[in-house]
Amino acid sequence: MVRKTKESAPVAEHHGGGHITVTAQQSRYALDAVDAPASKEILIKDLSITVANRELLSRTTLHLVEARHYVMVGRNGTGKSTILKAIADGLVPGIPWSTRILLLGQTREDSIEDGIDALGLESETVLQHVVRSDRVRERYVREAKMLSEAIEDSIDSMAPVRAYRRIGHERLALQLKEGHRIAERRSGARGKLARKELIKLEERFEESEKSLQEAEIDSTQLSEEMQAAADLLAGVQASLELMDANEAEAKARAVLLGLGFKEDRIDKLVSELSGGWKTRCELACALTQYADVLLLDEPTNFLDLPSIIWLQDYIRNLKGTTVLITTHDRDFGDAVAEELLVLRNQTLETFRGNLSLYERERWKKARYMTKMKEAQDKQKKHIEKTIAGNIKAAKDKGDDKKLKQAASRKKKLDDRMGLQVGLKGGRFKLNRDLGGYHLSRRAEIEIPDFDPPVQLSFPHQPPDLKFPGALVSLEKVSFAYPGRKKLPVLTDVNLTIHPGARIGLAGLNGSGKTTLASLIMGGDEGGLLPTSGTIARHARVKMGRFSQQSVEEITAMASSNPHITALRHLMDCVGDEAQEKDARAVLSGLGLHGQTVSDVPLVLLSGGQKVRVALAKLLWPPPQLLILDEVTTHLDADTILGLVMALREYEGALLVVTHDRFFMRTVVEGQSPYKLAPGVHAASEGEADESSESEDEEAGLAPGSVFRLTSKGQVRKLDLGMDEYEDIAARTAAKLARARR
């Protein structure tokens, strides 16, 4: 017997206060497994998720094998984050209630909701915040302390009883909260049973509340509850021992070090951290807790490369936990994915492997199926021509043999057209490979389809400079922020950027990459001035800079002016000479079309759409030097690929600051996207053949230069480019991993 269950709850704020509705098919066995699970495997069939009348998933299957590591990929707006939140909030029917699911960013809120006696963020250090974020451990620690102090109290004989009852009451409160949640979401016979259980829980809770008010009890009950308190303490201590509670602080410190925190920053107050470091802190909270299912939504945001490599090694070595990750970082995703969940067309497709392997296999299958179909179409055309000739000859000469030949060939055409290869790669066998009732004797040849490629275009030829020369030249430049009694951020920097150059900056967070970009922009362009040294700029150079604050600035502006649209904002930035058709053309080239730019308020656009608006402001008209500081943060993998292809055509100079290895290699070092991202073949207007790759390699982009900013504020050119920096980052990550052990 199969039935459908339905659950509904308010969705997160970023969905505008709508509701998320989840439906799924469940058997009686599955329903029983929800209450008494034998494993932590998640298998949800016929799953549909709708947000505010917009369907994200439609009758698909979600299958998460216990302890396997998954990466979910899909374009921005397809609902990846919403799906993770639906799983974490318990909205998906069929997931056992006892399964502990942890979503990055939820840890602290859960602790506060559970009433854990935690310090306020104003007075809590980073280490305290991470240690105390584990609500289960914190509850056990508090209970153990309460019971120990009560049992050791030699004056008040009732103290252990009161502590025992108080803990029992608090646990009942948690059970009651969960009981309400279950009763609200179940219907039919199971809903009726859940409501009966809820009534019993409410009665027990009322009795417990009354027992807290009792001042005296008889000696027999006192003795029994004293023993119960001692037994409860032993149980709590055993639970703490099983979860290595004594090692919580050491583990938290090791994880924080791995994520790039220095010792002095670990002892800082959480309230003093910037937004990026707070995000790292929340990631540490998620990594230090036990969970059956760990959900990480874009965990590499704000991480530098050593921390990214440390994190991918940490996840690969994580045993016994199912991990589901969304990420825009292709290299990171490829490193951690044991299995891929592809979200497209409102379904989840499962593939055993990572994104690059999936794209390669899908592209190879598309080529194979295309060639097979073309060959069969040619054969079919020839047979149809022969049949037509036989029928004509039979009519002209009254030849029955020709009619029989035509009928025979027509039967052959109907029976033998279609897939010639079986499920296991051998010869097609009807009974094995095409069971059930079908209208033909061969399976139809299905060529895998691809999402339309994200194609970004913008003016790629900056105005002529009129006379030659370097765009920017830095000579012995040093910089220190005023009032800071420390070493300069940058020391003796020598760097020259010529027209059309490709320069990449790599280094740890805080090493001075953004500061160097600000110095290149100069004081007149909203940048910085050097403490010492000289910076010479071409007299006619125009520079544009995308910074990590570009999206925040647009968001703040849109919040103060909630009715302004992307089109109006772009035209205001350009000035009086702006023409609407030109502004629309620039925005359209970056993927923002029609009513999205003219009618939808800028404040309602997604992070990825705001990135495109920020780029439009920089690229109209195109500058001779374009500085991109972490431009990929809000973009999905397909959009990053589209941006890569557009930037490879850009004739101006590029200065790229990024931790994304794929982006650095393809934009700065000129490596072929066809080699690093097999899925780029699908962007070749359906021409799935080797010629596209060979043409790209023959065209060959001149490799740029990658520079590393050292901890001493110096800029050093990496002769081996990003490969050399990745080796340096890997060694740093290995040191951090050894510190963890």
Each language-model region and where it sits:
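Charge-dense, low-complexity intrinsically disordered regions
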Residues: 430-470, 479-480
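Short alpha-helix boundary/capping motifs
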Residues: 284, 386, 415, 434, ...
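Alpha-helix boundary/capping and short turn/kink residues
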Residues: 245, 396-399, 422, 483
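ABC ATP-binding cassette signature C-motif
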Residues: 1-369, 456-741
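Extended amphipathic alpha-helical segments
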Residues: 298, 418-426
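Structured, non-catalytic alpha/beta "coupling" segments that mediate domain-domain communication
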Residues: 411, 415-417
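Hydrophobic alpha-helical membrane-spanning segments
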Residues: 157, 393-396, 419-420
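ABC ATPase nucleotide-binding domains
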Residues: 367-390, 394-411, 424-442, 723-741
